[in-house]
Amino acid sequence: MIAIIDYGMGNIRSVEQALKYIGAEHIVTSDKEEILRSDGVILPGVGAFPKAMEVLEERDLVCVLKEVCDIGKPLLGICLGMQLLFERSEELKGCSGLGLLPGEIRKLKVSYKIPHMGWNELRKEREFPLWNGLVDGSFVYYVHSYYADCPDEIVCGVSDYGMQVPGFVAKGNVFGAQFHPEKSGEIGMQILKNFQGVVEAWKSSRLSI
């Protein structure tokens, strides 16, 4: 069971429809116990980083997400959800994030139009489970104005937009996609299937203990 966290700022419906399409068992919830009972978690998001953190704090979801990380449960952040995984954002007056990944979220510093919106090539930087079955250079769909300034060792895929934009990041059981898998056609469906596979593997490992 994959829990899609509903905190009022996510692209919930499109993520839910994508999971239905690939046949992944899921629930949309903001309930702590349901999240902790799940086998994997997706944190979607659209909007402003500071407001999202404020809402997560108000709903007591920050501690839940940190607990999810601590117990090794697979966690996937999408778009703003990915950005929230980092330590801090400079958006507006600046704001602390969840601190599950090292790095800071910064405004895109490019001469191109902002937000970065549309299809872009995703190039492989290093292997990790969400690359399974994908061709290096596949096109994915972005909508964002900020990017993750983070250590190279957690960057698994990048796109060019006047600068290198981390598209895929990962550290341990924590995964992030700056682009929208749920809006990226069959490539995106494969990415979500790969996450489903990670979730199933984690569930099986827990059952065998």
UniProtKB/Swiss-Prot annotation:
Name of the gene:
hisH
The entry's localization annotation reads: Cytoplasm
- Membrane-crossing segments per the record: none
InterPro entries from the xrefs?
Answer: Class_I_gatase-like, GATASE, Imidazole-glycPsynth_HisH
Domain Glutamine amidotransferase type-1, first and last residues per copy? 1-205
Q: What NCBIfam families does this protein map onto? A: IMP_synth_hisH
GO cellular component terms attached to this protein's record? cytoplasm
Assembly with partners or alone:
Heterodimer of HisH and HisF.
Q: Where are the active-site residues found?
A: C79, H180, E182
- Which Pfam families does this entry report, sorted A to Z? GATase
Entry function: IGPS catalyzes the conversion of PRFAR and glutamine to IGP, AICAR and glutamate. The HisH subunit catalyzes the hydrolysis of glutamine to glutamate and ammonia as part of the synthesis of IGP and AICAR. The resulting ammonia molecule is channeled to the active site of HisF.
The Enzyme Commission number assigned here is: 4.3.2.10, 3.5.1.2
What is the protein name for this chain? Imidazole glycerol phosphate synthase subunit HisH
Please give one Gene Ontology molecular function term for this protein.
Answer: lyase activity
Q: Which UniProt keywords apply?
A: Amino-acid biosynthesis, Cytoplasm, Glutamine amidotransferase, Histidine biosynthesis, Hydrolase, Lyase
PANTHER family (UniProt xref): IMIDAZOLE GLYCEROL PHOSPHATE SYNTHASE SUBUNIT HISH
- Enumerate the Gene3D superfamilies for this protein: 3.40.50.880
Q: What pathway annotation does it carry?
A: Amino-acid biosynthesis; L-histidine biosynthesis; L-histidine from 5-phospho-alpha-D-ribose 1-diphosphate: step 5/9
Check the record and name the HAMAP family matching this protein.
HisH
Q: Which reaction does it catalyse?
A: 5-[(5-phospho-1-deoxy-D-ribulos-1-ylimino)methylamino]-1-(5-phospho-beta-D-ribosyl)imidazole-4-carboxamide + L-glutamine = D-erythro-1-(imidazol-4-yl)glycerol 3-phosphate + 5-amino-1-(5-phospho-beta-D-ribosyl)imidazole-4-carboxamide + L-glutamate + H(+); L-glutamine + H2O = L-glutamate + NH4(+)
The Gene Ontology biological process annotation of the record reads: L-histidine biosynthetic process
